[in-house]
Structure formats: structure tokens, C-alpha cells
Amino acid sequence: MSTFAEAPAGDLARGEKIFKTKCAQCHVAEKGGGHKQGPNLGGLFGRVSGTAAGFAYSKANKEAAVTWGESTLYEYLLNPKKYMPGNKMVFAGLKKPEERADLIAYLKQATA
């Protein structure tokens, strides 16, 4: 399952658990909230990488100009450093396709 289109359907509850255990230490997912070590993910879908106001992004993140959506997040979350070399995110990624799909399902709801 190398693409989001081939991934299993995401589960919102499992995605929330993944967010709380693997993402929440560095990110919040609420529109209008502040940033932590990583940027606030509120309004993530449709946003271009490196553009959340008030966060000091890496040059790589700003220059990548990735528009975040299901497919781009699915690829990015597999291996963030490989997808966007030079970005600040220290997270190694989610290797299981179902975990990436679950997290994306949660993020779609939580960041809207």
C-alpha cells in the first residue's frame, strides 16, 4: 500500500490515540491555538507547508511548498525526513499503512 488510495479506511478513534501518543507532545490540532515545539495543525488540510503564522519553520519546509492533503500526508508520515530532507521534525514516521490512515482520519476531523 504505497498510496493513500490503496490504504485501508482510517479509524477516527485509533487516529486520536495515535495523535495523543505520538504527536501531541509537539503539536496541537486546534484552529486558532498556539504552537508547541511543532506548529499548530489547525487548518492543516489545504495549507501549504511552512505557512502557519507565528511558527519558525525550517528553510526546507518553507521551500518544499507542499499542499497538505490525504495523499501528501500519507507519504510524509511514512518517513518525514526522507519526504522533506532538512525539516525539523524528529519523528521517525509511521510505517504501518493503517496507522497513517487512522491518523489522517483523525486529523481531518480535528483540524477542520
Swiss-Prot record:
It comes from Chlamydomonas reinhardtii. It is found in: Mitochondrion intermembrane space. The keyword Transport applies. GO terms for molecular function: electron transfer activity; heme binding; metal ion binding. It holds the Pfam family Cytochrom_C. PANTHER family: CYTOCHROME C (PTHR11961). Its main location: mitochondrion. One of its GO terms (cellular component) is mitochondrial intermembrane space. Binds 1 heme c group covalently per subunit. Heme c binds at residues 23, 26-27, 89. This is Cytochrome c. The lineage of its organism: Eukaryota, Viridiplantae, Chlorophyta, core chlorophytes, Chlorophyceae. Electron carrier protein. The oxidized form of the cytochrome c heme group can accept an electron from the heme group of the cytochrome c1 subunit of cytochrome reductase. Cytochrome c then transfers this electron to the cytochrome oxidase complex, the final protein carrier in the mitochondrial electron-transport chain. The keyword ATP-binding does not apply. SUPFAM superfamilies: Cytochrome c. Belongs to the cytochrome c family. Keywords: Electron transport, Heme, Iron, Metal-binding, Mitochondrion, Respiratory chain, Transport.
